[in-house]
Amino acid sequence: MGQSVVVLGAQWGDEGKGKIVDLLTEEIGAVVRFQGGHNAGHTLVINGKKTVLHLIPSGILRNGVLCLIGNGVVISPAALRKEIEELEDTGLEIRSRLKISPAAPLIMEYHIALDQAREKAAGGRAIGTTGRGIGPAYEDKVGRRGIRVADLHYPDQLAEKLRAALDYHNFVLTRYFGVDGMDFQRIYDEMLVFAEYVEPMKSDVAGILHDLRKQGKRVLFEGAQGTLLDIDHGTYPYVTSSSTTVGGALSGAGVGVQDIDYVLGIAKAYATRVGGGPFPTELDDKIGQGIRDRGVEYGASTGRPRRCGWMDIVALKRAVAINGITGLCITKLDVLDGMDKLKICIAYEYHDKRSEYAPLDAQGWEECTPVYLEFPGWNESTHGITSWEKLPPAARAYLCALEELAGCPIGIVSTGPDREHTIMLHDPFA
């Protein structure tokens, strides 16, 4: 039987999953995206060259690796085509290696208009979405009015479904938000063009995954966003619209729990968050700004500055428990170089009581005050180090503390953006 590893974010996203997925894809059969859409921004740096992927799995830069987009992903036709063409312009062969589930929902133009109208109307109460139609597309999926890749094969039924969806969404756009509605014919014509384009890539992703496992191939499941943004387990309502946990990998790709052999949780050596929502360890001072500057903490998809703070073990332990994380990968250790002291949040003060568990609602999180342990920093550079023994003693002590406090072993440490800037303590496929 083959081996399968799930790679997912153990914080609020932006943990560096793309680099780690690329690192682990050297000798595997396939990489599969199972949730989210082009709101993801997975940055890969190989020999100093930067590539940012939004929809296509990070294994695409490895020759011969099959890249799959599962039924749990919402697909923007325009974004997908743009990303494919940009990669093909670099000389990569894409379409023969990219397989897309017919059950994947499409992000339509009216989803984007609705997303942006909502955020504008919400003002200071906005969730902080990317404005790319992700949430409304998932709403249509659950509301059973979504248009899926499979629908493109049937022009008459597509027209019928599109008219029904437009009747609903144009009413909301024009009557509730007071913005322009969408034109049926233009969108329909665009969908017919996309139907022809995507047809050769359409394939039974779940079936491919089952066959690969029987053939003894290695498969990597690539998560987007992070556990604390999960629609069920995150800081609701300041969450994304999909399941970012290991449960999302099962339902979003079409595999069973017995098909997963290892869950790798990715976490930065500190913490970041984009958009609104509670963030107990946030540093709204020069220390936080310093981390942002050194870590280049700006969104790969939106360019928005990320909020920065100390490592939050309470939140990390929750991610470990929810996902059954087998091992952790700690990224961006080098960003902490040169800091006099470091802090790790080990508990919260909540309503005059100390708790090592996170509240289950956003308001509760907002009312938490972090309890910190302080650690000495280090002046030596860790950038590009590939051996545990060569890390400064204080850096090793910090990582050992993270491991002990989280109750989960650290298998990988990333010391820079390049594929080679990595300390491999345990290979998830070993």
Swiss-Prot record:
Pathway: Purine metabolism; AMP biosynthesis via de novo pathway; AMP from IMP: step 1/2. One of its GO terms (molecular function) is adenylosuccinate synthase activity. Its main location: cytoplasm. Pfam families: Adenylsucc_synt. Disulfide bonds: none annotated. It is an enzyme of class 6 (ligase). The active site is at 14 (proton acceptor), 42 (proton donor). Mg(2+) binds at residues 14, 41. Its EC number is 6.3.4.4. InterPro entries: Adenylosuccin_syn_GTP-bd, Adenylosuccin_syn_Lys_AS, Adenylosuccinate_synth_dom1, Adenylosuccinate_synth_dom2, Adenylosuccinate_synth_dom3, Adenylosuccinate_synthetase, P-loop_NTPase. SMART domains: Adenylsucc_synt. GO terms for biological process: 'de novo' AMP biosynthetic process; IMP metabolic process. It comes from the Bacteria. Signal peptide: none annotated. Its cofactor is Mg(2+). Substrate binds at residues 300-306. The keyword GTP-binding applies. GTP binds at residues 13-19, 41-43, 306, 332-334, 414-416. Binds 1 Mg(2+) ion per subunit. It catalyses: IMP + L-aspartate + GTP = N(6)-(1,2-dicarboxyethyl)-AMP + GDP + phosphate + 2 H(+). SUPFAM superfamilies: P-loop containing nucleoside triphosphate hydrolases. Homodimer. Belongs to the adenylosuccinate synthetase family. Plays an important role in the de novo pathway of purine nucleotide biosynthesis. Catalyzes the first committed step in the biosynthesis of AMP from IMP. NCBIfam families: PRK01117.1, purA. This is Adenylosuccinate synthetase. The gene is purA.
